[in-house]
Amino acid sequence: MPKTHSYETTVTWTGNTGSGTSGYRDYERANEISTAGKPAIPGSSDPAFRGDPARWNPEELLVASLSQCHMLWFLHLCSAAGVVVTSYRDQPIGTMTETEDGGGHFTEIALRPEVGFAEPAQAARAAELHKRAHELCFIANSVNFPVRCDPV
């Protein structure tokens, strides 16, 4: 029987500058993402939508979520296969298209992991393990756009 997991967070708008949402330019997009027992994450919208560039926006969090999920599966699979990873860094790129009505959607996210191995010969298994990590990634299995893995 499948296991069900539940995730709870709190998103609190902190951008009321005194007049609420009385006008498009009259409020900040600042918010705080939190959950019990963890540091809060400062959030905002993308700067293109009047957001604070110093805060995380939902689009960045989605891209990071896909990258992190893939990495964690990849590390697990490498460990199980006896492939010793010594470093891992990904610089993923998400592409979002804005529609004429102001909405939009992601069209693709490209993961670009750069992985170091204890023994360079172990890198040969990396492509197979990246493919399997992608197949198992909970987040990649939950989105309706392509997620590519292009190892560096």
Q: What would you call each of these model-derived segments?
A:
Residues M1-A64, L72-V152:
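Extended beta-strand/beta-hairpin segments
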